[in-house]
Amino acid sequence: MARRSILLSQRLLLMDKFNSIADAIDCGASMTEQATGRLMDVDGGTCALGAAMVAVDLTPITANLPLLVKRFPQPMPMICPICDGEMPRSSHYKHLALLVHLNDFHAMPREQIAHWIRSQLS
């Protein structure tokens, strides 16, 4: 139990290095190839969300998505920049779900996803 607490403390410190989830995506994207359909593939490739997780030393096994949401809050739903107006019912996403949608459905490069997030948060 103490080891788990130490690991959580280390991950929180890693998360504090990043001002936004976009920064974490950029960092993780620089360490891995892009993957779709899963957080991390068998070759170590990651989706946008997986890249952010790699940056803070999380894996699909140690994933703590509530911790990511708490550290990188998104106060309102975001609208998919590609689906907007085309599919109104499915173009509204909350926080981390939009990262998965842009990565998997639109095959948007992770760095472009990070750039778009920054443009929405500024």
Report each predicted region and the residues it spans.
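Domain-length accessory/inserted modules outside core catalytic folds
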Residues: 1-46, 53-122
